[in-house]
Amino acid sequence: MREIISIHIGQAGIQVGNACWELYCLEHGIEPDGTMPSDTSVGVAHDAFNTFFSETGSGKHVPRAIFVDLEPTVIDEVRTGSYRQLFHPEQLISGKEDAANNFARGHYTVGKEIVDLCLDRVRKLADNCTGLQGFLVFNAVGGGTGSGLGSLLLERLSVDYGKKSKLGFTIYPSPQVSTAVVEPYNSVLSTHSLLEHTDVAVLLDNEAIYDICRRSLDIERPTYTNLNRLISQIISSLTTSLRFDGAINVDVTEFQTNLVPYPRIHFMLSSYAPVISAEKAYHEQLSVPEITNAVFEPSSMMAKCDPRHGKYMACCLMYRGDVVPKDVNAAVATIKTKRTVQFVDWCPTGFKCGINYQPPSVVPGGDLAKVQRAVCMISNNTAVAEVFSRIDHKFDLMYAKRAFVHWYVGEGMEEGEFSEAREDLAALEKDYEEVGAEGADDEGDEGEDY
């Protein structure tokens, strides 16, 4: 088997995790108590869904996941929620005091005490796997736990499981909406370790997803539940091919191979289509070309940055439902002729496609309509640098005055780490600039094309 272990860190990671596991259970017909009425081969571990669930002798399906937070309230909601019987109590790890939005607390003082327990639980899950493929790590980098403990866990996983892939689903601070004053510090400090210790990181930001909920689903005031259900659709689409058998399956390591041209250039944009409410879906015919066009729309991006400002290096299209390769090829050919979707000149093909015949599921009573086919795109675009430059700018404004720095130093961090992390990000922005400009010497004659 090619198992995958999910690690959910901090409030954001856990709440996204709840949405994901709710959706996985729905897709596989697993009840909230872990039983699976449709599973005839109880205890036989070669079903495709065993990548994400392990089976006990009594036929209970347990997610291969751990949830970690430095304070108990969010995890207590899982312990008392409707899926409380799904998880083994040891998979839910909570501390007593939180990281107080402070990277240094999550990484040095408070996080240090809990990290060995987490790794111990991960080890138990890993020992239960026959061929562990890698880790999915869910966290936000604005807070203290997601950024600090998230970085610490990634660093330790690199030591313990050096060769396994690590995919991060990372919620970045939004341009306008902020939940903490020190978000820029935490983000810069933890991006520093995301750079080194993840193989692919998918950037998400709440503001972009709010806008999608407002615009496409007509939800006036989206809640985190609305956002997380949308995020879970993306993550589900990415992992469909690991959990079901399909026509063109895409493995986690394949994502890496196809999306990451240089090791540092591994921050991805994601988009999903169709995001549509049930009332509208009734009147619209959503064909393969239509949904394919939709995922390239700047307004579909799940992070606030404009792909038209950059160039695509690669993109991965994961279709699910009633889709045949012929339609996909035609849709992709049309996209290639568009002036708005520009690829770097050193990567002429740039498309990796996957198809899975399992139609998308939606949570009953949720906002999304049940549709016949959907597509999720993960793309590597140089415009992602906008996200970093925005955060860097805010970081600089605060750090010039050394504002709030004493809270970090007081928890055992050294001031040098700030400048080191900031320089690393400056280098990253530069890397993106260069990747987008490669082959720029022959661009002088482009004006005559029109």
Curated annotation (Swiss-Prot):
Q: Which InterPro entries match?
A: Alpha_tubulin, Beta-tubulin_BS, Tub_FtsZ_C, Tubulin, Tubulin/FtsZ-like_C, Tubulin/FtsZ_2-layer-sand-dom, Tubulin/FtsZ_GTPase_sf, Tubulin_C
Processing and modification events after translation? Undergoes a tyrosination/detyrosination cycle, the cyclic removal and re-addition of a C-terminal tyrosine residue by the enzymes tubulin tyrosine carboxypeptidase (TTCP) and tubulin tyrosine ligase (TTL), respectively.
Where it sits in the cell: the answer is: Cytoplasm, Cytoskeleton
Broad enzyme group: hydrolase
Q: Which UniProt keywords are given for this protein, alphabetically ordered?
A: Cytoplasm, Cytoskeleton, GTP-binding, Hydrolase, Magnesium, Metal-binding, Microtubule, Nucleotide-binding
Q: Which residues of the sequence carry a binding annotation for GTP? A: 11, 71, 144-145, 179, 206, 228
The family database entries (Gene3D superfamilies) matched by this protein are listed as: Helix hairpin bin, Tubulin/FtsZ, C-terminal domain, Tubulin/FtsZ, GTPase domain
Listed under catalytic activity are: GTP + H2O = GDP + phosphate + H(+)
Which BP terms in the Gene Ontology apply to this protein?
Answer: microtubule-based process
Molecular-function GO terms, alphabetical: GTP binding; hydrolase activity; metal ion binding; structural constituent of cytoskeleton
Which residues carry out catalysis? 254
The UniProt record lists the EC number as 3.6.5.-
* Annotated positions for site Involved in polymerization: 450
Name the major location: cytoplasm
Q: How does it assemble?
A: Dimer of alpha and beta chains. A typical microtubule is a hollow water-filled tube with an outer diameter of 25 nm and an inner diameter of 15 nM. Alpha-beta heterodimers associate head-to-tail to form protofilaments running lengthwise along the microtubule wall with the beta-tubulin subunit facing the microtubule plus end conferring a structural polarity. Microtubules usually have 13 protofilaments but different protofilament numbers can be found in some organisms and specialized cells.
Q: Which family does it belong to?
A: Belongs to the tubulin family.
User: What protein is this chain from?
Assistant: Tubulin alpha-3 chain
Q: Which organism is it from?
A: Eleusine indica
Primary gene name: TUBA3
